[in-house]
C-alpha cells in the first residue's frame, strides 16, 4: 500500500469540525478503561529469543509503573539503574530490538514515569541539602552525584529521538512524504518510533523544569499543535503538552499565546470530564486542570482579553473575587499573584547537584523562578490604574496624571515606557512555536511627546455571529 493510500485510509484529522472533535472525544473514551497496555505487553511473545523478549517486556512494564511515594533512597538508586539498563539495551543492541508493542499508550507511561522520577529525585536531593538534617542520606547523595543526573536524562531522551529519526519522520509528514523513507531500520519499528516521539514531549517538560523556556518550545518544531498530532490521542500527554507550552509562553511574556494554549485544552477537558472519572490519571488531570485555570487568571490580569464563554464562566466560578483583585492591580495584588503562581507553576529543578557542605547557598528553584516572575508583575502593577485614566483623554499632561496617581513624574514616565514596551508582544501565526509577529496587545495605545501624552484607543467589535451560533447550538 502506498503512502497516499495509507493516508486516505484514515479520516481527515485536519478538519476542524465538530465531527472531528467528537471523534477525538470518543477516542479518549476508549482510553479511560485502558490498563496502560501493560497486560497486553506482558502477554506479547516473540518467535525469536523468547526469554530475552519476556525480560524486556518485564523491564518495560516496570519502567511504566509508578514508584512508591515513600520509596527509600536505595530504591530510587535501583530504579535509576534499571532505567539505565533498559535504555542501554534498547539503544545499543546490535540492530533494532524486535518487540511488537500493543499501542502507543505504554510508551507515554514509560517516558512520563522516567521524567517524574528524575524530577522528584532532584527536588528531594535539594531538600536534603538545604535542610542539612539527615547526614546519612546527604553522604549517600554526595557520593552519587551522577545518579539521576540532568545530563544522563537529557542524553537518554535525545538518543531515543536520534535513534528513531522521529524528527525527520515528522518533517517528512509535514511535506506530504512517506515517513518510512527517512525512518531507517530503527525508526520503522513501533518500539523506537513511539519512545522517540514521546521523548520530544519529555524534552519539552525537562527544559521547562530547568527554566529554559525558549529551548522547551524549540523542541516541538516538528510537531504540529493540532488534533491530528499523536500526543492528542493520549489524554495525559495531550494535557501535559499544552500545560508546558502555555507555561513557557507565559514566562516569555507571550500572554496571548499562553491564553490560547490553556483555553484549547481546558475546553477539551470540559467536554470529556463526564467519563474521565473512571481513568487512572483522573486525579492528576484534575489537579493540572485547576493549575491551568490559575495560570489563565494570571495571564488575563496581565493581558486583558476576551475568553471563550466556557472558560470565562469556569474562571469566574473558581476565582471570582481573586480575579477582580488581580485585574485591579496595585500592591495589594502582589501576594495573590505569588500565591497563584506558586500553586500552579511546575516544580522547577536545578541542573546541577546542590552543595551539601554549605546548605545556606542552595536556592530553591521554585523560589528563584517565582522571584523572576514577581519582578515582571511589579513592573505592571499600576497598568490598570493608568489605563483607567488614559481612557478618559485623547491628550494628557504627564504631571497631571502623576498628580492623580500621587507619584513623581519621572517615575510615571518610566512606568509608561515599560507598559508601552510590554504592550508589544510576539503572537504566533504559523511555523514553529517560537516564531510569531509583533502585535500591539492592548486596545489602548499612546505616545509621549516631551510631557504630553497622546492617547488612541481601538475597540474591536463583538463577533455577534459566533455568539448566536454558540448559543443556538446549546438551545437546539
UniProtKB/Swiss-Prot annotation:
**Where in or outside the cell?**
Cytoplasm
Q: What does the subunit section of this Swiss-Prot or TrEMBL entry state?
A: Component of the eukaryotic translation initiation factor 3 (eIF-3) complex.
Q: Give the species.
A: Aspergillus clavatus (strain ATCC 1007 / CBS 513.65 / DSM 816 / NCTC 3887 / NRRL 1 / QM 1276 / 107)
UniProt-listed InterPro entries: eIF3l (IPR019382), PCI_dom (IPR000717)
Q: Which residues form the PCI domain?
A: 257-452
**MF GO annotations:** translation initiation factor activity
Role played: Component of the eukaryotic translation initiation factor 3 (eIF-3) complex, which is involved in protein synthesis of a specialized repertoire of mRNAs and, together with other initiation factors, stimulates binding of mRNA and methionyl-tRNAi to the 40S ribosome. The eIF-3 complex specifically targets and initiates translation of a subset of mRNAs involved in cell proliferation.
As for family, the record states: Belongs to the eIF-3 subunit L family.
What protein name is recorded for this chain? Eukaryotic translation initiation factor 3 subunit L
Entry GO terms, CC: eukaryotic 43S preinitiation complex; eukaryotic 48S preinitiation complex; eukaryotic translation initiation factor 3 complex
Is the keyword GTP-binding assigned to this protein?
Answer: no
Keyword list, A-Z: Cytoplasm, Initiation factor, Protein biosynthesis
Q: Name one GO biological process term.
A: formation of cytoplasmic translation initiation complex
- Tell me if Cytoplasm is a UniProt keyword of this record: yes
Amino acid at each position: 500500500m502506498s503512502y497516499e493510500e495509507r493516508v486516505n485510509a484514515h479520516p481527515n484529522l485536519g478538519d476542524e469540525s465538530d465531527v472531528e472533535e467528537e471523534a477525538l472525544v470518543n477516542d479518549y473514551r476508549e482510553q479511560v478503561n485502558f490498563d496502560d497496555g501493560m497486560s497486553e505487553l506482558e502477554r506479547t511473545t516473540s518467535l525469536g529469543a523468547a526469554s530475552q523478549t519476556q525480560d524486556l517486556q518485564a523491564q518495560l512494564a516496570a519502567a511504566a509503573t509508578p514508584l512508591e511515594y515513600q520509596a527509600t533512597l536505595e530504591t530510587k538508586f535501583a530504579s535509576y539503574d534499571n532505567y539505565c539498563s533498559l535504555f542501554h539495551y534498547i539503544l545499543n543492541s546490535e540492530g533494532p530490538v524486535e518487540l511488537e508493542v500493543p499501542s502507543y499508550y505504554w510508551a507515554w507511561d514509560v517516558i512520563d514515569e522516567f521524567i517524574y522520577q528524575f524530577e522528584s529525585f532532584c527536588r528531594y536531593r535539594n531538600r536534603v541539602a538545604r535542610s542539612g538534617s539527615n547526614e546519612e542520606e546527604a553522604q549517600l547523595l554526595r557520593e552519587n552525584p551522577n545518579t539521576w543526573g540532568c545530563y544522563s536524562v537529557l542524553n537518554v531522551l535525545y538518543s531515543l529521538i536520534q535513534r528513531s529519526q522521529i524528527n525527520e519522520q515528522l518533517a517528512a509528514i509535514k511535506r506530504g512524504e512517506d515517513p518510512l523513507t527517512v525512518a531507517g531500520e530503527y525508526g520503522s519499528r513501533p518500539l523506537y518510533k513511539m519512545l522517540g516521539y514521546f521523548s520530544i514531549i519529555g524534552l519539552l517538560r525537562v527544559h521547562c523544569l530547568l527554566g529554559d523556556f525558549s529551548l522547551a518550545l524549540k523542541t516541538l518544531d516538528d510537531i504540529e499543535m493540532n488534533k491530528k498530532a499523536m500526543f492528542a490521542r493520549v489524554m495525559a500527554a495531550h494535557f501535559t503538552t499544552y500545560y508546558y507550552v502555555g507555561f513557557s509562553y507565559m514566562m516569555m511574556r507571550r500572554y496571548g499565546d499562553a491564553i490560547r494554549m490553556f483555553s484549547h485544552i481546558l475546553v477539551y477537558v470540559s467536554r470529556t470530564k463526564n467519563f474521565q472519572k473512571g481513568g487512572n490519571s483522573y486525579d492528576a488531570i484534575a489537579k493540572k486542570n485547576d493549575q491551568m485555570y490559575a495560570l489563565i487568571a494570571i495571564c488575563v490580569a496581565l493581558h486583558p482579553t476576551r475568553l471563550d464563554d466556557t472558560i470565562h464562566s469556569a474562571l469566574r466560578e473558581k476565582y471570582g473575587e481573586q480575579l477582580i483583585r488581580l485585574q485591579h492591580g496595585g500592591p495589594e495584588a502582589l501576594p495573590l499573584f505569588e500565591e497563584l503562581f506558586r500553586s500552579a507553576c511546575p516544580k522547577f529543578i536545578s541542573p546541577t547537584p546542590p552543595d551539601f557542605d554549605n546548605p545556606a547557598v542552595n536556592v530553591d528553584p521554585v523560589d528563584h523562578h517565582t522571584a523572576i516572575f514577581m519582578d515582571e508583575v511589579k513592573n505592571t502593577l499600576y497598568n490598570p490604574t493608568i489605563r483607567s485614566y488614559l481612557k478618559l483623554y485623547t491628550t494628557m499632561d504627564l504631571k497631571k496624571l502623576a498628580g492623580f496617581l500621587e507619584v513623581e513624574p519621572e517615575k510615571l514616565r518610566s512606568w509608561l515606557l515599560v507598559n508601552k514596551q510590554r504592550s508589544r508582544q510576539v503572537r504566533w501565526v504559523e511555523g514553529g512555536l517560537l516564531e510569531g509577529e509583533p502585535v500591539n496587545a492592548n486596545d489602548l495605545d499612546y505616545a509621549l511627546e516631551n510631557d504630553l501624552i497622546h492617547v488612541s484607543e481601538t475597540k474591536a467589535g463583538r463577533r455577534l455571529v459566533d455568539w448566536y451560533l454558540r448559543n443556538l447550538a446549546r438551545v437546539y
